[in-house]
Regions:
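Acidic/aromatic-lined carbohydrate-recognition and catalytic surfaces
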Residues: 80-193, 197, 330-337, 343-347, ...
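The substrate-binding groove and active-site-proximal loops of carbohydrate-active enzymes
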Residues: 44-56, 86-102, 132, 238-240, ...
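Catalytic domains of carbohydrate-active enzymes, especially glycoside hydrolases
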Residues: 59-81, 103-110, 445, 522
Length: 527
């Protein structure tokens, strides 16, 4: 009985196996065939760089036929640099010229002949979205400011220094008066660099030095000493950058009253950062410290291994500092990134570094914007402030100055990422022209993808509608807190950090909702 049962089970199993196997074999063959002869949707693509305008019809045909032979589905046409930047290659097709558009037209027709598709970037070069049609007013904007110390108690009629202006473009946002207790200039210090290398045959001059431009460099343990004639109260340390240098933000701060006995103040911690980190300096807040001697110790030991923070100073630790500035006024820890002036992620400011007494309350700050009248840089402030010393903070915005740097004939300022009109203007003057300057019928068949590549245009933290968008999205008015964008603490450390986080959230949302969303909408309408 058991033997018969086993035979029946075996027979049923064999029958089931023979029923399934052909399907499995057929499916396996199908997958293999699909891999060897993929559908158009599954075919790989490649980048097609047109370098320095060195492109010809013969070269276009050869390239595209090779792509077809290799089984590619298409290619992203991307011109890089112009004919003048690669003069040794004798390029003839400068971007935006009739010669260049003829090459684009020919490449589309050849791709159409071969059954290939094309994609193009949103601008000349590979980063990110700019061109010569973008004016400073239409470009990415940042908040800038200047400050002036005045005495209150009497009528003033003064002109204030204009903040930074890129290509003479600047617009005011607001003018504030903030009370200050001590308006004395920062004290001058004697600066000494000392080698701490233990290797006997290494001379100090070989390990730490200050060059003719004042840049301090070292590959070995060292310290930088600031010596003051009188005790100086330091609340923050501004590191002036000389290119990306992660090591400059790993200093251990020590202080002394006599130059012999030193006490620990703080170990500076670098912010998380991208490789494009040089638009702004980096300010580290410290507990208020009064001393005559400040030392900044550095050692390559303990450096974080190389990671997404693309800085060669992690792989080969070298200290490079253009300048250290010690300030007596309170500032939020690494406020430059928190204000959206540069992309960084830093530790929150601690209350022992910036206390409640160091933060301006809204009631202390006087808004003088309406009393500041005139045009451009000939505006005059007419006002009477209460007695005492006041800092006049003139805040405005200008272009960041970032361009699509890898471009050639189409190089220009990066468009305002918060303004749908400038995003459309960018699209209309580049990608849309690929249809207008060629055969539109062929272009619609071939040019099927719009490519938005590497974000290499720094940051943006303002435009004319930013305050309106902020209030709509966050539910409160940013304008009374505008000094926060200059690193000035307001209300409390917790409140300051929260508002700046809201600023960054608004920046992020506008980039997505305006820049990318608008490009997606108008891109779909074309391809």
């Amino acid at each position: 009985m058991k033997s018969r049962l086993k035979q029946r089970i075996f027979a049923l199993s064999l029958l089931a196996w023979t029923a399934v196997c052909p399907a499995d074999a057929q499916q396996t063959r199908s997958l293999r065939d699909q891999f060897l002869s993929p559908s158009d949707e599954a075919k790989p693509w490649t980048f097609w760089y047109w370098m320095y305008g060195t492109v010809s019809k013969e070269g276009i045909t050869a390239d595209l036929e090779a792509m077809k032979h290799a089984g590619l589905g298409g290619t992203y046409l991307m011109p890089i640099k112009g004919i003048h930047e690669g003069a040794q290659y004798d390029g003839k097709a400068q971007q935006l010229t009739p010669e260049w558009w003829e090459m684009v037209r020919f490449s589309m027709e050849e791709a159409d002949r071969l059954g290939l598709k094309l994609g193009m970037h949103i601008c000349d070069g590979f980063a990110l979205a700019g061109g010569p049609w973008i004016t400073p007013e239409e470009s990415m904007q940042k908040v800038v400011w200047s400050d002036t110390i005045v005495n209150g108690g009497k009528l003033m009629a003064i002109r204030l220094p204009q903040p930074e202006a890129y290509e003479n473009y600047y617009e005011d946002i607001a003018l504030f008066a903030l009370p200050v207790e001590d308006a004395a200039d920062e004290m001058q210090a004697k600066i000494t660099c000392v080698n701490l290398a233990t290797t006997g045959n290494v001379k100090a001059a070989q390990t730490v030095n200050m060059d003719a431009t004042g840049v301090i460099r070292s590959s070995y343990p060292c310290y930088i000493q600031y010596e003051y004639e009188q005790p100086f109260t330091c609340r923050n340390i501004e590191i002036v950058l000389n290119g990306n240098n992660y090591q400059a933000h790993r200093l251990k701060v020590m202080a002394s009253d006599d130059g012999v006995n030193y006490r620990f103040v703080k170990q500076l911690v670098p912010a998380r950062q991208g490789w494009q980190n040089t638009d702004e300096n980096s300010t580290h807040s410290i507990p208020p410290t009064t001393a005559r001697f400040f030392r900044f110790y550095w050692t390559p030991e303990g450096s974080e291994p190389g990671s997404e923070d693309m800085d060669a100073a992690k792989w080969k630790p070298n200290l490079k500092i253009k300048e250290l500035r010690l300030h007596r006024e309170a500032r939020l820890n690494q406020w430059e990134g928190k204000a959206g002036l540069v992309w960084r992620v830093a530790q929150a400011t601690k209350e022992e570094e910036v206390g409640k007494q160091d933060c301006y309350s809204l009631s202390q700050v006087i808004n003088l914007t309406k009393q500041y009248t005139g045009h451009s840089n000939v505006k005059t402030l007419t006002a009477t402030l209460p007695k005492g010393k006041w800092k006049l903070l003139r805040m405005g915005h200008t272009a960041t100055g970032h361009t699509n740097a890898t471009a050639g004939g189409g190089k220009g300022l990066e468009c305002d990422k918060f303004n749908p009109k400038t995003v459309r203007k960018q699209f209309d003057n580049w990608f849309a022209q690929a249809f207008a300057k060629t055969n539109p019928e062929v272009a619609r068949r071939v040019l099927k993808y719009m490519h938005v590549d590497s974000w290499e245009c720094g940051s943006q933290n303002w435009n004319k509608r930013f305050a309106i968008e902020f209030q709509k999205r966050r539910g409160y008015d940013l304008m009374p807190y505008l000094p926060l964008l200059a690193g000035i603490p307001m209300e409390s450390v917790e409140q300051s950090e929260k508002i700046l986080r809201d600023v960054r959230t608004t920046i992020s949302e506008l980039i997505v909702d305006v820049f990318y969303q608008v490009l997606a909408e108008i891109g779909r309408a074309h391809v």
